[in-house]
Amino acid sequence: MKRIYVLFTALCICGALAAQDVKELLILHTNDTHSRVEPIPVTDPNPEYAGKAGFVRRATLIKGMREQNKDLLLFDCGDFSQGSPYYNMFKGEVEVKLMNEMGYDAGTIGNHEFDFGLDNMARLFKMANFPIVCANYGVKGTVLEGIVKPYVILEREGVKIGVFGLSPVLEGLVQTKNYEGVVFESPIEAAQRVAKILKEQEKCDLVVCLSHLGWKGEPYSDETLIANTRNIDIVLGGHSHSYFDKTLFYKNLDGRDIPLQQMGKNAVYVGKMKVEMEKN
């Protein structure tokens, strides 16, 4: 497929195009769902959250949207773990099996995935019917070797989509014994390397970053990531539990506006991004 342009119709930044000239992709995404298997209690003090979320609602929403668009993409940006007795008792098995039922296409690693150590992570990731991608954790020599990949390439209607993940500094967030042998690399350096591979070697039409770095802050966040990289077309975020009611745009190294979305926590919201891609 020839080189294509990425247009974000939700913000109406493109003009009218002939239908035959356009490929349309629908991306759904979650982050920091934190074992929210059941709805949030109606007694929750936050009226925006009370009585909302839960697996059944999320699965029903996704199923309905997939019936309208069978080629939609579904991603998770980390921290599906920790937050309910289900996780404490079954150590993530319930969450992964439910994600399998919902048909996720890829996910990245959040810090809470380490809460029961590497052996448990390997068990869960093998159980997942979707790839786990993380470009900035070196896992050679650990039980995660061969399970966690830096990126995955998906295809929808002839469009090649490269998807890679970025995860946070573990020191201070995770007990040392729970990530022994995992080597952290600067997410900016990892992103530059992998995004270039996806664009130039793999010839991907669209490059999506699943980030668990958090929205703002130094030295590593989605803001600093976009400002210091190129070849990334979309960043879907997590970790900071930030809810965006609209897509944010930040300029990359080439001065391009790169879209960023994040959907709070506990799967109260599922992110939706509609992408129109025009052939060159």
Each predicted region: which residue ranges?
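C-terminal segment of classical bacterial N-terminal signal peptides
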Residues: 13-19
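Acidic, metal/ion-coordinating pockets
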Residues: 19-280
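Sec-dependent N-terminal signal peptides
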Residues: 4-13
